Amino acid sequence: MLKKLNLLLFALLTQLSFSQNSEKCITTKLVNESVTEDVRNYIATEEIATKNNKWRAENSNSVKETIIVPIVVHIVHKNTHVNVGSGTNISDAQIEDAIRILNQDFSKTNIEFPNPPRNTFLNLAADVQIQFCFATTDENGNPTNGITRTSTTKSDWDPDTEANDMKRNNTGGKDGWDPEEYLNIWVCDLYAPPQGGMTLGYSYLPGSVTWSMWKDGLVVDYRYFGTIGVSAPSNDGSTPTHEIGHYLGLMHTFCEEIDGNGNPICCDNDDNNWGGYVDDTPASKDVYWGTVNASTNNNTCNDLSYSNNFNTNVLDMDENFMSYSSDVWMFTHEQSSVMNGTMNGYRSSLKNSPASVNCTGTVGIDNLLDNNQIRIYPNPTKGRVLIQNLMQIPNNSIIVRNILGEIILTSNSRNSLVSLDLSHLENGVYFIDVSSNNGIRIEKVILAK
């Protein structure tokens, strides 16, 4: 059965002829190891991909609503970096910047649009309609700002031998939160070989760690998280975007196969079951590491030789987030379809997570109000929401926002019980901010009339 992996283009990276920079992302290597070590992970990945493709075929014309994903960022820092903002103990501002860029990338509001450096594939660029928001409640319902900080005696982590050690308390890292309710993001110091070619980040395809779910999530080196204090050339802040693409079912857009002599060959790397049969990314050979602009004209494969959506031979899509180019800016419509299929299938528990979230940046944990102070119910609601002030907190200010952060409704009340009527709004996700002199409570509310 495992021989089918070759048909799915999951060759070991050690068999590939990439340059010394080839381990920018080691997802392919890790997935190959996981499904080889435990055949149940292989079976799960295959079944999940098949179900995803079936869902996409059945829902190709459905209207999408923006999906909210609760995230928690685990900063695993050197014990010598005690102060927040020092070295590996990166600042809240850098973390917020990384998530801001992530959400811009997934909504096609990144700085490259509406006029990207080249417009070759402008008509294929998609708004994925998935938004990532800091959790404001942890697994036990306690207030959180969506960031944990763990001091470790480890100087760094070698992705080749310690790829998952930062995810466990007993190996110097931090245990992740329930992966069915939160997207865990570990940020740490990944070992940088003196000869170059360090790993920037990695994650796992849906299902590939079904039998070891504690590994689920993504890892990003602290030097490539956001744009504040990060390192060139991958300083556009899109490393998390690439890794979450894998986490939601996408493969690299460049070919990961070689011929009998070890030379790169042409292939359509994501046009297979595990890749979602993505037909709007052209075939390309090997990896392009450079910048992309109006004069970039790489065309390494004849697209007329492949079954895809192109009726002519087009340039390589080096600007795709799933490539290795040094500046990238787009997902395609079919890539968006794959990721939305994952969120409505294998990762639907994230979509329906009970965790409260904050989509406007982090809030100091000392300023968060918990369920013992403010209660917001029912949730989901058919239109009316009650806000119960359990501690007689003075000067309540209530704001209702949509998923874009736009203010829909405001209210000021000193009453112990406030009733909000949302029945005039469209079905979807809204956020209720209750603030007072004592702090703030942010609740995700689903309106389903």
Task: Please name every model-derived segment.
Residues 3-10:
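Sec-dependent signal peptide recognition
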Residues 10-18:
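Hydrophobic h-region of N-terminal signal peptides that target proteins for export
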Residues 20-66, 106:
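N-terminal zymogen propeptides
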Residues 55-103, 187-192:
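Fold-level signature of zinc-dependent metallopeptidase catalytic domains
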Residues 93-100, 104, 238, 320, ...:
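Solvent-exposed, polar/charged alpha-helical surfaces in well-ordered, non-transmembrane soluble domains
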Residues 100-294, 298:
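Metzincin-family zinc-dependent endopeptidase catalytic domain
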Residues 332-367:
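A recurrent domain-boundary module in secreted/ectodomain proteins
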Residues 368-449:
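C-terminal outer-membrane/trafficking sorting elements
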